[in-house]
Protein backbone atom coordinates (compact mmCIF):
# COMPACT_ATOMS: atom_id res chain seq x y z
CA UNK A 1 0.00 0.00 0.00
CA UNK A 2 2.84 2.39 0.85
CA UNK A 3 4.43 1.65 -2.52
CA UNK A 4 1.12 2.39 -4.28
CA UNK A 5 0.75 5.65 -2.34
CA UNK A 6 4.31 6.65 -3.24
CA UNK A 7 3.67 5.85 -6.92
CA UNK A 8 0.42 7.83 -6.85
CA UNK A 9 2.14 10.79 -5.14
CA UNK A 10 5.04 10.80 -7.60
CA UNK A 11 2.63 10.59 -10.55
CA UNK A 12 0.50 13.42 -9.14
CA UNK A 13 3.55 15.62 -8.53
CA UNK A 14 4.86 14.97 -12.05
CA UNK A 15 1.46 15.85 -13.55
CA UNK A 16 1.24 18.96 -11.38
CA UNK A 17 4.73 20.09 -12.46
CA UNK A 18 3.78 19.59 -16.11
CA UNK A 19 0.53 21.52 -15.54
CA UNK A 20 2.37 24.39 -13.83
CA UNK A 21 4.91 24.61 -16.65
CA UNK A 22 2.03 24.84 -19.14
CA UNK A 23 0.82 28.06 -17.46
CA UNK A 24 2.85 30.90 -18.96
CA UNK A 25 4.42 33.52 -16.75
CA UNK A 26 3.29 36.92 -18.00
CA UNK A 27 4.73 40.40 -17.64
CA UNK A 28 3.76 43.92 -18.68
CA UNK A 29 4.18 47.61 -17.97
CA UNK A 30 1.35 48.46 -15.54
CA UNK A 31 1.71 52.24 -15.66
CA UNK A 32 0.99 54.49 -18.67
CA UNK A 33 3.77 54.52 -21.30
CA UNK A 34 5.95 57.59 -21.63
CA UNK A 35 8.39 59.44 -19.39
CA UNK A 36 7.37 59.64 -15.72
CA UNK A 37 8.85 59.63 -12.23
CA UNK A 38 8.06 55.95 -11.63
CA UNK A 39 7.13 53.05 -13.90
CA UNK A 40 5.84 49.72 -12.60
CA UNK A 41 6.52 46.42 -14.37
CA UNK A 42 4.43 43.50 -13.13
CA UNK A 43 5.37 39.81 -13.48
CA UNK A 44 2.87 37.06 -12.61
CA UNK A 45 2.96 33.29 -12.86
CA UNK A 46 4.78 30.17 -11.65
CA UNK A 47 8.19 31.47 -12.79
CA UNK A 48 7.85 35.06 -11.57
CA UNK A 49 10.43 34.58 -8.80
CA UNK A 50 12.90 32.90 -11.19
CA UNK A 51 12.66 35.89 -13.51
CA UNK A 52 13.23 38.29 -10.60
CA UNK A 53 16.27 36.32 -9.40
CA UNK A 54 17.72 36.35 -12.90
CA UNK A 55 17.43 40.15 -13.04
CA UNK A 56 18.30 41.05 -9.43
CA UNK A 57 19.98 38.02 -7.84
CA UNK A 58 17.37 37.55 -5.11
CA UNK A 59 13.73 38.11 -4.22
CA UNK A 60 12.73 40.00 -1.03
CA UNK A 61 10.42 38.60 1.62
CA UNK A 62 6.73 38.82 0.71
CA UNK A 63 5.18 42.30 0.95
CA UNK A 64 8.43 44.04 1.91
CA UNK A 65 9.70 46.67 -0.52
CA UNK A 66 13.43 46.22 -1.08
CA UNK A 67 15.96 48.07 -3.19
CA UNK A 68 17.51 45.90 -5.89
CA UNK A 69 19.98 46.48 -8.71
CA UNK A 70 18.43 45.31 -11.97
CA UNK A 71 20.95 43.89 -14.46
CA UNK A 72 20.56 42.68 -18.02
CA UNK A 73 20.85 38.84 -17.95
CA UNK A 74 22.79 38.69 -21.23
CA UNK A 75 25.03 41.80 -21.12
CA UNK A 76 25.35 41.95 -17.29
CA UNK A 77 24.99 45.74 -17.51
CA UNK A 78 23.14 47.66 -14.80
CA UNK A 79 19.71 48.80 -16.02
CA UNK A 80 18.39 50.56 -12.92
CA UNK A 81 18.10 50.55 -9.15
CA UNK A 82 14.50 49.69 -8.39
CA UNK A 83 12.15 48.84 -5.56
CA UNK A 84 11.10 45.21 -5.77
CA UNK A 85 7.93 43.81 -4.18
CA UNK A 86 7.03 40.13 -3.96
CA UNK A 87 3.46 38.92 -3.40
CA UNK A 88 3.34 35.20 -2.67
CA UNK A 89 0.45 33.17 -4.05
CA UNK A 90 -2.44 33.05 -3.28
CA UNK A 91 -2.23 36.44 -1.52
CA UNK A 92 -1.73 38.53 -4.64
CA UNK A 93 -3.98 40.30 -7.14
CA UNK A 94 -3.82 37.41 -9.61
CA UNK A 95 -3.67 34.61 -7.04
CA UNK A 96 -0.25 33.64 -8.45
CA UNK A 97 3.29 34.59 -7.45
CA UNK A 98 3.63 38.25 -8.44
CA UNK A 99 6.77 40.41 -8.56
CA UNK A 100 6.55 44.16 -9.14
CA UNK A 101 9.48 46.33 -10.17
CA UNK A 102 9.16 50.04 -9.39
CA UNK A 103 11.61 51.56 -11.85
CA UNK A 104 12.56 55.08 -12.79
CA UNK A 105 10.08 56.07 -15.48
CA UNK A 106 12.43 56.78 -18.37
CA UNK A 107 11.55 55.27 -21.73
CA UNK A 108 14.91 53.51 -22.09
CA UNK A 109 14.74 52.10 -18.54
CA UNK A 110 11.33 50.53 -19.21
CA UNK A 111 12.15 49.25 -22.69
CA UNK A 112 15.45 47.64 -21.65
CA UNK A 113 13.85 46.07 -18.54
CA UNK A 114 11.08 44.51 -20.64
CA UNK A 115 13.72 43.24 -23.09
CA UNK A 116 15.74 41.82 -20.17
CA UNK A 117 12.71 39.87 -18.90
CA UNK A 118 12.15 38.47 -22.39
CA UNK A 119 15.82 37.40 -22.62
CA UNK A 120 16.00 36.01 -19.07
CA UNK A 121 16.15 32.44 -20.36
CA UNK A 122 13.18 31.40 -18.22
CA UNK A 123 10.89 29.05 -20.20
CA UNK A 124 7.25 29.77 -21.04
CA UNK A 125 7.25 33.52 -20.43
CA UNK A 126 5.53 36.13 -22.60
CA UNK A 127 4.12 39.67 -22.63
CA UNK A 128 0.61 39.87 -21.16
CA UNK A 129 -2.53 40.41 -23.22
CA UNK A 130 -4.94 43.26 -22.29
CA UNK A 131 -6.75 42.38 -19.07
CA UNK A 132 -4.85 39.12 -18.58
CA UNK A 133 -3.81 39.88 -15.00
CA UNK A 134 -7.48 40.53 -14.14
CA UNK A 135 -8.52 37.38 -16.01
CA UNK A 136 -6.18 35.32 -13.84
CA UNK A 137 -7.54 37.04 -10.72
CA UNK A 138 -11.03 35.92 -11.75
CA UNK A 139 -10.14 32.31 -12.57
CA UNK A 140 -8.07 32.00 -9.38
CA UNK A 141 -10.99 33.22 -7.25
CA UNK A 142 -9.41 36.53 -6.24
CA UNK A 143 -12.26 38.62 -7.68
CA UNK A 144 -15.69 38.02 -9.17
CA UNK A 145 -16.95 39.48 -12.42
CA UNK A 146 -18.76 42.43 -10.80
CA UNK A 147 -15.64 43.47 -8.88
CA UNK A 148 -13.58 43.46 -12.08
CA UNK A 149 -16.25 45.44 -13.94
CA UNK A 150 -16.22 47.88 -11.03
CA UNK A 151 -12.44 48.10 -11.36
CA UNK A 152 -12.85 49.08 -15.03
CA UNK A 153 -15.22 51.85 -13.92
CA UNK A 154 -12.75 52.99 -11.23
CA UNK A 155 -10.00 53.28 -13.84
CA UNK A 156 -12.29 55.11 -16.28
CA UNK A 157 -13.88 57.43 -13.68
CA UNK A 158 -13.50 61.12 -14.54
CA UNK A 159 -15.35 62.68 -11.59
CA UNK A 160 -15.66 62.07 -7.85
CA UNK A 161 -19.25 60.77 -8.01
CA UNK A 162 -18.33 58.30 -10.77
CA UNK A 163 -15.42 57.12 -8.62
CA UNK A 164 -17.52 56.65 -5.46
CA UNK A 165 -20.16 54.69 -7.38
CA UNK A 166 -17.55 52.49 -9.10
CA UNK A 167 -15.81 51.72 -5.80
CA UNK A 168 -19.01 50.25 -4.34
CA UNK A 169 -19.02 47.74 -7.19
CA UNK A 170 -15.27 47.12 -7.08
CA UNK A 171 -15.39 46.45 -3.33
CA UNK A 172 -18.06 43.76 -3.66
CA UNK A 173 -21.39 45.47 -2.92
CA UNK A 174 -23.06 43.91 -5.98
CA UNK A 175 -21.42 40.56 -5.30
CA UNK A 176 -22.75 40.54 -1.73
CA UNK A 177 -26.35 41.13 -2.75
CA UNK A 178 -26.14 38.61 -5.61
CA UNK A 179 -24.64 36.04 -3.24
CA UNK A 180 -27.62 36.54 -0.89
CA UNK A 181 -30.16 36.26 -3.71
CA UNK A 182 -28.52 33.19 -5.23
CA UNK A 183 -28.24 31.44 -1.88
CA UNK A 184 -31.96 31.98 -1.19
CA UNK A 185 -32.97 30.87 -4.70
CA UNK A 186 -30.96 27.66 -4.33
CA UNK A 187 -32.82 27.01 -1.06
CA UNK A 188 -36.19 27.70 -2.72
CA UNK A 189 -35.36 25.43 -5.65
CA UNK A 190 -34.21 22.63 -3.32
CA UNK A 191 -37.46 22.88 -1.35
CA UNK A 192 -39.62 22.82 -4.49
CA UNK A 193 -37.76 19.90 -6.07
CA UNK A 194 -37.83 17.93 -2.83
CA UNK A 195 -41.57 18.53 -2.62
CA UNK A 196 -42.28 17.11 -6.09
CA UNK A 197 -42.07 13.49 -4.93
CA UNK A 198 -44.28 14.13 -1.92
CA UNK A 199 -47.04 16.32 -3.32
CA UNK A 200 -50.27 15.11 -4.83
CA UNK A 201 -50.40 15.84 -8.57
CA UNK A 202 -47.58 18.36 -8.02
CA UNK A 203 -49.92 20.88 -6.39
CA UNK A 204 -48.95 22.76 -3.25
CA UNK A 205 -51.06 24.77 -0.89
CA UNK A 206 -49.46 24.28 2.54
CA UNK A 207 -48.45 27.22 4.70
CA UNK A 208 -44.70 26.74 4.18
CA UNK A 209 -45.03 26.81 0.41
CA UNK A 210 -47.27 29.87 0.50
CA UNK A 211 -44.60 31.62 2.58
CA UNK A 212 -41.94 30.60 0.03
CA UNK A 213 -43.84 32.23 -2.82
CA UNK A 214 -44.40 35.36 -0.73
CA UNK A 215 -40.63 35.58 -0.24
CA UNK A 216 -40.11 35.00 -3.98
CA UNK A 217 -42.46 37.90 -4.69
CA UNK A 218 -40.54 40.14 -2.26
CA UNK A 219 -37.26 39.17 -3.95
CA UNK A 220 -38.72 39.99 -7.36
CA UNK A 221 -39.78 43.44 -6.10
CA UNK A 222 -36.27 44.01 -4.75
CA UNK A 223 -34.66 42.94 -8.03
CA UNK A 224 -37.02 45.19 -10.03
CA UNK A 225 -36.10 48.14 -7.79
CA UNK A 226 -32.41 47.48 -8.43
CA UNK A 227 -33.03 47.36 -12.19
CA UNK A 228 -34.62 50.82 -12.05
CA UNK A 229 -31.92 52.12 -9.71
CA UNK A 230 -29.26 50.77 -12.07
CA UNK A 231 -30.76 52.74 -14.96
CA UNK A 232 -30.33 55.91 -12.93
CA UNK A 233 -26.74 55.01 -12.08
CA UNK A 234 -26.08 54.43 -15.79
CA UNK A 235 -26.71 58.17 -16.19
CA UNK A 236 -23.81 58.76 -13.80
CA UNK A 237 -21.57 56.32 -15.69
CA UNK A 238 -22.18 57.93 -19.10
CA UNK A 239 -22.64 61.56 -18.00
CA UNK A 240 -25.79 63.61 -17.42
CA UNK A 241 -27.02 65.11 -20.68
CA UNK A 242 -27.89 68.80 -20.12
CA UNK A 243 -29.15 71.15 -22.85
CA UNK A 244 -28.79 74.94 -22.50
CA UNK A 245 -31.68 76.74 -24.22
CA UNK A 246 -33.19 80.19 -24.37
CA UNK A 247 -33.54 83.25 -26.58
CA UNK A 248 -30.64 84.78 -28.50
CA UNK A 249 -28.15 86.89 -26.52
CA UNK A 250 -29.35 85.57 -23.16
CA UNK A 251 -25.85 84.39 -22.21
CA UNK A 252 -25.99 80.67 -23.07
CA UNK A 253 -22.52 80.64 -24.63
CA UNK A 254 -21.13 82.67 -21.72
CA UNK A 255 -22.57 80.07 -19.34
CA UNK A 256 -21.00 77.06 -21.07
CA UNK A 257 -17.64 78.88 -21.27
CA UNK A 258 -17.88 79.65 -17.56
CA UNK A 259 -18.75 76.07 -16.56
CA UNK A 260 -16.11 74.57 -18.85
CA UNK A 261 -13.56 77.10 -17.56
CA UNK A 262 -12.39 77.73 -21.12
CA UNK A 263 -13.67 79.23 -24.36
CA UNK A 264 -16.00 76.72 -25.98
CA UNK A 265 -18.52 78.97 -27.71
CA UNK A 266 -18.21 82.35 -29.43
CA UNK A 267 -19.72 85.18 -27.37
CA UNK A 268 -21.05 88.10 -29.42
CA UNK A 269 -23.77 90.77 -29.07
CA UNK A 270 -24.95 89.77 -32.54
CA UNK A 271 -27.98 87.44 -32.58
CA UNK A 272 -27.61 83.99 -34.10
CA UNK A 273 -23.87 83.54 -33.44
CA UNK A 274 -24.33 79.93 -32.29
CA UNK A 275 -25.62 77.89 -35.23
CA UNK A 276 -24.80 74.29 -34.29
CA UNK A 277 -24.95 72.47 -30.94
CA UNK A 278 -21.60 72.62 -29.13
CA UNK A 279 -20.90 69.91 -26.54
CA UNK A 280 -18.43 69.69 -23.69
CA UNK A 281 -18.05 67.30 -20.74
CA UNK A 282 -17.63 69.16 -17.44
CA UNK A 283 -17.33 68.19 -13.78
CA UNK A 284 -20.01 69.89 -11.66
CA UNK A 285 -19.42 69.10 -7.97
CA UNK A 286 -18.34 65.56 -8.84
CA UNK A 287 -21.06 64.84 -11.39
CA UNK A 288 -20.08 64.26 -15.05
CA UNK A 289 -22.23 66.59 -17.15
CA UNK A 290 -22.42 66.69 -20.94
CA UNK A 291 -23.39 70.31 -21.66
CA UNK A 292 -24.87 71.33 -25.02
CA UNK A 293 -24.83 75.00 -26.04
CA UNK A 294 -27.54 75.55 -28.65
CA UNK A 295 -28.78 78.18 -31.06
CA UNK A 296 -31.08 80.85 -29.62
CA UNK A 297 -34.77 80.00 -29.97
CA UNK A 298 -36.44 82.72 -32.01
CA UNK A 299 -38.59 83.44 -35.06
CA UNK A 300 -38.63 86.29 -37.52
CA UNK A 301 -37.86 87.37 -41.05
CA UNK A 302 -34.21 88.01 -40.16
CA UNK A 303 -33.66 84.36 -39.19
CA UNK A 304 -31.53 82.83 -41.93
CA UNK A 305 -31.96 79.28 -43.21
CA UNK A 306 -28.81 77.99 -41.53
CA UNK A 307 -29.94 79.48 -38.19
CA UNK A 308 -33.32 77.76 -38.59
CA UNK A 309 -31.49 74.45 -38.85
CA UNK A 310 -29.60 75.33 -35.66
CA UNK A 311 -32.90 76.07 -33.89
CA UNK A 312 -34.26 72.66 -34.94
CA UNK A 313 -31.09 71.05 -33.59
CA UNK A 314 -31.59 72.96 -30.31
CA UNK A 315 -35.12 71.61 -29.93
CA UNK A 316 -33.87 68.10 -30.70
CA UNK A 317 -31.21 68.43 -27.98
CA UNK A 318 -33.92 69.51 -25.54
CA UNK A 319 -35.80 66.33 -26.44
CA UNK A 320 -32.72 64.14 -25.90
CA UNK A 321 -31.51 65.84 -22.72
CA UNK A 322 -32.07 64.55 -19.20
CA UNK A 323 -32.13 68.07 -17.74
CA UNK A 324 -32.74 71.43 -19.41
CA UNK A 325 -31.30 74.82 -18.46
CA UNK A 326 -33.31 77.78 -19.76
CA UNK A 327 -31.35 81.05 -19.79
CA UNK A 328 -33.10 84.45 -19.93
CA UNK A 329 -31.87 88.03 -19.44
CA UNK A 330 -32.89 89.84 -16.23
CA UNK A 331 -34.97 92.45 -18.09
CA UNK A 332 -38.65 91.57 -17.51
CA UNK A 333 -39.74 93.05 -20.84
CA UNK A 334 -37.19 90.91 -22.70
CA UNK A 335 -38.22 87.91 -20.60
CA UNK A 336 -41.95 88.31 -21.33
CA UNK A 337 -41.29 88.96 -25.03
CA UNK A 338 -39.21 85.78 -25.21
CA UNK A 339 -42.03 83.72 -23.72
CA UNK A 340 -44.41 85.00 -26.38
CA UNK A 341 -42.33 83.18 -28.97
CA UNK A 342 -43.83 79.78 -29.66
CA UNK A 343 -40.38 78.18 -30.07
CA UNK A 344 -39.49 78.87 -26.43
CA UNK A 345 -42.94 78.37 -24.90
CA UNK A 346 -43.53 75.02 -26.61
CA UNK A 347 -40.08 73.77 -25.65
CA UNK A 348 -40.73 74.59 -21.98
CA UNK A 349 -44.14 72.90 -22.13
CA UNK A 350 -42.62 69.81 -23.79
CA UNK A 351 -40.07 69.48 -20.98
CA UNK A 352 -42.81 69.82 -18.38
CA UNK A 353 -44.98 67.22 -20.13
CA UNK A 354 -42.07 64.78 -20.08
CA UNK A 355 -41.53 65.56 -16.37
CA UNK A 356 -37.95 66.43 -17.18
CA UNK A 357 -36.00 68.46 -14.57
CA UNK A 358 -35.78 72.16 -15.54
CA UNK A 359 -33.70 74.99 -14.10
CA UNK A 360 -34.19 78.65 -15.07
CA UNK A 361 -31.22 81.03 -15.06
CA UNK A 362 -32.01 84.73 -15.07
CA UNK A 363 -28.70 86.07 -16.33
CA UNK A 364 -26.93 89.45 -16.59
CA UNK A 365 -27.81 90.67 -13.08
CA UNK A 366 -24.60 92.70 -13.23
CA UNK A 367 -26.22 94.93 -15.87
CA UNK A 368 -28.84 96.38 -13.47
CA UNK A 369 -28.48 98.35 -10.25
CA UNK A 370 -31.12 96.49 -8.22
CA UNK A 371 -31.57 93.03 -9.70
CA UNK A 372 -33.66 91.68 -6.80
CA UNK A 373 -36.53 94.03 -7.71
CA UNK A 374 -36.42 92.91 -11.35
CA UNK A 375 -35.93 89.24 -10.45
CA UNK A 376 -39.02 89.05 -8.23
CA UNK A 377 -41.74 89.33 -10.94
CA UNK A 378 -39.88 86.90 -13.23
CA UNK A 379 -39.67 84.31 -10.46
CA UNK A 380 -43.34 84.84 -9.58
CA UNK A 381 -44.35 84.37 -13.23
CA UNK A 382 -42.44 81.07 -13.54
CA UNK A 383 -43.85 79.77 -10.26
CA UNK A 384 -47.43 80.71 -11.15
CA UNK A 385 -47.56 79.69 -14.82
CA UNK A 386 -45.19 76.71 -14.91
CA UNK A 387 -45.19 75.61 -11.24
CA UNK A 388 -41.38 75.83 -11.13
CA UNK A 389 -40.04 75.39 -7.56
CA UNK A 390 -38.20 78.36 -6.09
CA UNK A 391 -34.95 76.37 -5.77
CA UNK A 392 -34.88 75.92 -9.56
CA UNK A 393 -35.00 79.62 -10.45
CA UNK A 394 -31.65 81.40 -10.15
CA UNK A 395 -30.41 84.97 -10.57
CA UNK A 396 -26.84 84.84 -11.88
CA UNK A 397 -24.17 86.79 -13.69
CA UNK A 398 -21.96 84.83 -16.06
CA UNK A 399 -19.66 87.86 -16.12
CA UNK A 400 -19.11 88.43 -12.38
CA UNK A 401 -20.07 84.87 -11.28
CA UNK A 402 -22.63 86.28 -8.82
CA UNK A 403 -25.12 83.59 -7.77
CA UNK A 404 -23.07 80.87 -9.46
CA UNK A 405 -22.23 78.88 -6.32
CA UNK A 406 -25.87 78.71 -5.19
CA UNK A 407 -26.96 77.72 -8.70
CA UNK A 408 -24.39 74.91 -8.95
CA UNK A 409 -25.36 73.64 -5.51
CA UNK A 410 -29.04 73.50 -6.51
CA UNK A 411 -28.10 71.81 -9.79
CA UNK A 412 -26.04 69.21 -7.89
CA UNK A 413 -29.04 68.46 -5.66
CA UNK A 414 -31.10 67.75 -8.78
CA UNK A 415 -28.35 65.49 -10.13
CA UNK A 416 -28.29 63.65 -6.79
CA UNK A 417 -32.04 62.96 -7.08
CA UNK A 418 -31.55 61.75 -10.66
CA UNK A 419 -28.84 59.20 -9.85
CA UNK A 420 -30.12 58.21 -6.38
CA UNK A 421 -33.91 58.16 -6.70
CA UNK A 422 -35.96 57.77 -3.55
CA UNK A 423 -37.17 54.19 -3.14
CA UNK A 424 -39.20 52.16 -0.71
CA UNK A 425 -37.54 52.19 2.72
CA UNK A 426 -37.25 48.42 2.54
CA UNK A 427 -35.34 48.56 -0.73
CA UNK A 428 -32.19 50.67 -1.07
CA UNK A 429 -31.52 50.26 -4.79
CA UNK A 430 -28.60 52.63 -5.33
CA UNK A 431 -25.92 50.33 -6.72
CA UNK A 432 -24.33 50.95 -10.11
CA UNK A 433 -25.58 47.93 -12.07
CA UNK A 434 -24.23 48.16 -15.62
CA UNK A 435 -26.19 47.20 -18.74
CA UNK A 436 -24.97 43.57 -18.82
CA UNK A 437 -25.83 43.07 -15.16
CA UNK A 438 -29.28 44.67 -15.58
CA UNK A 439 -30.04 42.32 -18.48
CA UNK A 440 -29.27 39.37 -16.20
CA UNK A 441 -31.52 40.83 -13.50
CA UNK A 442 -34.33 41.44 -16.01
CA UNK A 443 -34.15 37.82 -17.15
CA UNK A 444 -34.16 36.67 -13.52
CA UNK A 445 -37.22 38.84 -12.79
CA UNK A 446 -39.05 37.36 -15.79
CA UNK A 447 -38.40 33.81 -14.58
CA UNK A 448 -39.56 34.71 -11.07
CA UNK A 449 -42.76 36.17 -12.56
CA UNK A 450 -43.42 32.90 -14.38
CA UNK A 451 -42.69 30.94 -11.20
CA UNK A 452 -45.22 33.05 -9.30
CA UNK A 453 -47.80 32.70 -12.07
CA UNK A 454 -47.32 28.91 -12.08
CA UNK A 455 -47.20 28.56 -8.29
CA UNK A 456 -49.87 25.85 -8.47
CA UNK A 457 -47.58 23.72 -10.69
CA UNK A 458 -44.56 22.80 -8.63
CA UNK A 459 -42.58 21.32 -11.55
CA UNK A 460 -42.83 24.47 -13.67
CA UNK A 461 -42.18 26.72 -10.66
CA UNK A 462 -39.05 24.77 -9.71
CA UNK A 463 -37.70 25.02 -13.28
CA UNK A 464 -38.28 28.78 -13.41
CA UNK A 465 -36.53 29.25 -10.05
CA UNK A 466 -33.61 27.21 -11.42
CA UNK A 467 -33.35 29.50 -14.46
CA UNK A 468 -33.58 32.59 -12.22
CA UNK A 469 -30.72 31.20 -10.11
CA UNK A 470 -28.56 30.81 -13.23
CA UNK A 471 -29.29 34.42 -14.24
CA UNK A 472 -28.03 35.69 -10.87
CA UNK A 473 -24.95 33.48 -11.27
CA UNK A 474 -24.23 35.14 -14.61
CA UNK A 475 -24.00 38.54 -12.91
CA UNK A 476 -20.99 37.50 -10.81
CA UNK A 477 -19.56 34.91 -13.20
CA UNK A 478 -20.59 31.93 -11.05
CA UNK A 479 -22.13 30.48 -14.24
CA UNK A 480 -19.70 29.94 -17.12
CA UNK A 481 -20.01 32.50 -19.94
CA UNK A 482 -16.71 32.30 -21.83
CA UNK A 483 -17.80 34.69 -24.59
CA UNK A 484 -18.83 37.33 -22.03
CA UNK A 485 -15.61 36.91 -20.04
CA UNK A 486 -13.41 37.64 -23.06
CA UNK A 487 -15.31 40.86 -23.82
CA UNK A 488 -15.03 42.13 -20.23
CA UNK A 489 -11.32 41.35 -19.84
CA UNK A 490 -10.50 42.99 -23.18
CA UNK A 491 -11.72 46.32 -21.75
CA UNK A 492 -8.69 46.44 -19.44
CA UNK A 493 -5.42 47.95 -20.58
CA UNK A 494 -2.27 45.83 -20.85
CA UNK A 495 -0.76 45.41 -17.39
CA UNK A 496 -4.05 45.15 -15.48
UniProtKB/Swiss-Prot annotation:
<dbReference type="Pfam" id="PF10396">
    <property type="entry name" value="TrmE_N"/>
</dbReference>
<feature type="domain" description="TrmE-type G">
    <location>
        <begin position="239"/>
        <end position="416"/>
    </location>
</feature>
<dbReference type="InterPro" id="IPR004520">
    <property type="entry name" value="GTPase_MnmE"/>
</dbReference>
<dbReference type="InterPro" id="IPR005225">
    <property type="entry name" value="Small_GTP-bd"/>
</dbReference>
<keyword id="KW-0547">Nucleotide-binding</keyword>
<dbReference type="Pfam" id="PF01926">
    <property type="entry name" value="MMR_HSR1"/>
</dbReference>
<dbReference type="GO" id="GO:0070899">
    <property type="term" value="P:mitochondrial tRNA wobble uridine modification"/>
</dbReference>
<dbReference type="GO" id="GO:0003924">
    <property type="term" value="F:GTPase activity"/>
</dbReference>
<dbReference type="GO" id="GO:0005525">
    <property type="term" value="F:GTP binding"/>
</dbReference>
<protein>
    <recommendedName>
        <fullName>tRNA modification GTPase mss1, mitochondrial</fullName>
    </recommendedName>
</protein>
<dbReference type="GO" id="GO:0002098">
    <property type="term" value="P:tRNA wobble uridine modification"/>
</dbReference>
<dbReference type="InterPro" id="IPR006073">
    <property type="entry name" value="GTP-bd"/>
</dbReference>
<keyword id="KW-0342">GTP-binding</keyword>
<dbReference type="GO" id="GO:0005743">
    <property type="term" value="C:mitochondrial inner membrane"/>
</dbReference>
<dbReference type="InterPro" id="IPR018948">
    <property type="entry name" value="GTP-bd_TrmE_N"/>
</dbReference>
<dbReference type="InterPro" id="IPR025867">
    <property type="entry name" value="MnmE_helical"/>
</dbReference>
<feature type="binding site">
    <location>
        <begin position="246"/>
        <end position="253"/>
    </location>
    <ligand>
        <name>GTP</name>
    </ligand>
</feature>
<dbReference type="GO" id="GO:0005737">
    <property type="term" value="C:cytoplasm"/>
</dbReference>
<dbReference type="InterPro" id="IPR027368">
    <property type="entry name" value="MnmE_dom2"/>
</dbReference>
<comment type="similarity">
    <text>Belongs to the TRAFAC class TrmE-Era-EngA-EngB-Septin-like GTPase superfamily. TrmE GTPase family.</text>
</comment>
<dbReference type="Pfam" id="PF12631">
    <property type="entry name" value="MnmE_helical"/>
</dbReference>
<keyword id="KW-0809">Transit peptide</keyword>
<keyword id="KW-0819">tRNA processing</keyword>
<dbReference type="GO" id="GO:0005739">
    <property type="term" value="C:mitochondrion"/>
</dbReference>
<feature type="binding site">
    <location>
        <begin position="293"/>
        <end position="297"/>
    </location>
    <ligand>
        <name>GTP</name>
    </ligand>
</feature>
<comment type="function">
    <text>GTPase involved in the 5-carboxymethylaminomethyl modification (mnm(5)s(2)U34) of the wobble uridine base in mitochondrial tRNAs.</text>
</comment>
<keyword id="KW-0496">Mitochondrion</keyword>
<dbReference type="GO" id="GO:0030488">
    <property type="term" value="P:tRNA methylation"/>
</dbReference>
<feature type="transit peptide" description="Mitochondrion">
    <location>
        <begin position="1"/>
        <end position="19"/>
    </location>
</feature>
<dbReference type="InterPro" id="IPR027417">
    <property type="entry name" value="P-loop_NTPase"/>
</dbReference>
<feature type="binding site">
    <location>
        <begin position="363"/>
        <end position="366"/>
    </location>
    <ligand>
        <name>GTP</name>
    </ligand>
</feature>
<dbReference type="InterPro" id="IPR031168">
    <property type="entry name" value="G_TrmE"/>
</dbReference>
<dbReference type="InterPro" id="IPR027266">
    <property type="entry name" value="TrmE/GcvT_dom1"/>
</dbReference>
Amino acid sequence: MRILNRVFLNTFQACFRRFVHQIPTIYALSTPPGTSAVAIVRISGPNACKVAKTLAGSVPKPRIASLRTIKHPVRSEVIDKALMLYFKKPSSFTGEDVVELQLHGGTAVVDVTLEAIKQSGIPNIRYAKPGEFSERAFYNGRADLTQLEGLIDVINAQTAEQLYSANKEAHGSIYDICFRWRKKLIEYRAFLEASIDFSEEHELDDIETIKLFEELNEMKDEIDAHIEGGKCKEVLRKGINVAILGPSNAGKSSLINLLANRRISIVSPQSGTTRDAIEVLVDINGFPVLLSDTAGLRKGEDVQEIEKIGIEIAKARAEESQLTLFVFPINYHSFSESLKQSEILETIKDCLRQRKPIHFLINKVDCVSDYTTMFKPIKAYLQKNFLIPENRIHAVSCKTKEGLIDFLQALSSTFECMVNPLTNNKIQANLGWNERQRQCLSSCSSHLSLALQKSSDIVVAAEEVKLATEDIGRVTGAVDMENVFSVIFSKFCVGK
